[in-house]
A protein has these predicted regions:
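Core alpha/beta nucleotide-donor-binding catalytic domains of modification enzymes
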Residues: 4-123, 133-137, 141-143, 152
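Short alpha-helical patches at coil-to-helix transitions and adjacent helical residues
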Residues: 23, 141, 176, 365-369, ...
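Redox-cofactor binding/interface segments in oxidoreductases and associated redox assembly factors
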Residues: 89, 129, 311-312
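Short glycine-rich anion-binding loops that position phosphate/pyrophosphate groups of nucleotides
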Residues: 91-94, 184-185, 315
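C-terminal target-recognition/interaction regions appended to catalytic cores
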Residues: 233-383
Length: 383
């Protein structure tokens, strides 16, 4: 565990910690739902590289949660265990995933155990864990049941609950499961119907999510984050609401000074250009909306549908595989970092890694912030 500078909690909001925080999708959702996320914990330097810029009021603690003790967690928060209202987190899930082979002995599978180990030790008023649907299948489902059976009896459990981020207003289809635990001594339980109240009436489309974004640019040492100006104004009325929300300048407890300043000038990051060889461009050109390029297996997005699940790829410790990136609906190129972030539900002030590879890992590994925000809002209304 590295030496840290603790940002002491300053508000009266319920306080949560984010385990396996990564880029901070759950952290973002917790702030937006009315919580104070006092600390995020993760072992990855790359996936958390912009965490402190995006969340200036949240302490980031680089640590291996497989070996972390409760004392390490409390030291990182500046709180006593009884002062932590909630624990949220999405332990890495590649070992459970249907994409590629599911590996029963993948060491990442034990991270769920450590999430629940810390929940059992800290005993927060509630917890929320997000993961992939593959966790519901053997042998992983038996392991999950053992973890849940060991929780203190006062927890009222909801889940594993299958959810799709599109139902909560994201422009991408992303199926995940959530497990919610509520300490019935302090908080009224949350039912599936309470979560369903947060479903949107109309699911946003790719067009509604990215219609105002510019073409990619060649990044330079002076502009490694790919800042560029918007290419259009948001649609009028309800069809423009997705973009208008994404463009909002954040409150002072969120976002960096740089992103706030640039956003106020109409500039947004994430437009680093991917250089495609002429042969690749020719292959992309032959793919209709909704089709798949037969060699790369890259799908072309459809303007008036949702984006399929955005994948993360892997880090160097697991082969450095780059994820399949969708082709833009009408341009013969893959989507940019910002287009992916928009589809996944991240606001425009949110910064990612300066490289496309790691940025797509950050986005693909993240809890969908819109889904998480609505689930946490349902819990917040009970506190």
């Amino acid at each position: 565990m590295t030496q840290i500078q603790i940002r002491m909690p300053t508000s009266t909001k319920p306080k949560v910690i984010d385990l396996f925080c990564g880029a901070g999708g759950f952290t973002l959702a917790s702030w937006q739902a009315g919580f104070e996320c006092v600390a995020g914990f993760d072992a990855s330097e790359v996936l958390t590289s912009r965490f402190s810029e995006n969340f200036p009021k949240t302490t980031f603690v680089k640590c291996d949660l497989q070996s972390a003790q409760v004392s390490d967690i409390l030291r990182g928060t500046g709180l006593k265990a009884r002062e932590i209202d909630g624990i949220i987190g999405g332990p890495p899930c590649q070992g459970f995933s249907w994409i590629g082979r599911r590996e029963a002995n993948d060491p990442r599978n034990t991270l769920i155990h450590h999430f629940f180990r810390l929940v059992r030790s800290i005993v927060p008023r509630f917890f929320v864990m997000e993961n992939v649907p593959g966790l519901l299948h053997q042998p992983f489902s038996s392991r999950l049941k053992r973890e849940l059976d060991q929780l203190p009896q006062q927890y009222s459990l909801l889940g594993p609950l299958p959810l799709d981020s599109a139902d909560f207003g994201a422009a991408t289809r992303r199926q995940r499961i959530l497990i919610i635990g509520i300490d019935s001594r302090y908080v009224d339980s949350v039912a599936k119907e309470d979560i369903a109240k947060h479903y949107v009436r109309t699911i946003p489309t790719v067009r509604e999510a990215i219609h105002d974004l510019p073409e990619p640019i060649s990044s330079t040492s002076q502009n490694s984050d790919g800042w560029a100006g918007y290419s259009a104004e948001p649609f009028h009325g309800e069809r423009g609401s997705y973009v208008k929300k994404a463009r909002r300048i954040p409150p002072m407890h969120l976002g960096s000074v740089l992103s706030r300043e640039f956003l106020s000038k109409g500039l947004v990051s994430g437009f680093q250009k991917t250089q495609h060889a002429p042969e690749i461009v020719r292959r992309f050109k032959s793919v209709a909306e909704g089709g798949t390029e037969p060699i790369s297996r890259f799908p072309r997005l459809q303007w008036d549908e949702q984006c399929p699940t955005l994948r993360a790829g892997t880090g160097p410790e697991n082969g450095s595989y780059q994820s399949v990136r969708p082709i833009h609906p009408s341009r013969d190129r893959v989507i940019t970092i910002r287009e992916a972030a928009r589809l996944q539900g991240f606001p425009d002030w949110f910064l990612f890694h300066s490289t496309k590879w790691h940025s797509f890992r950050m986005i693909g590994n993240s809890v969908n912030p819109q889904m998480a925000r609505e689930v946490l809002s349902a819990i917040r209304s009970r506190l």
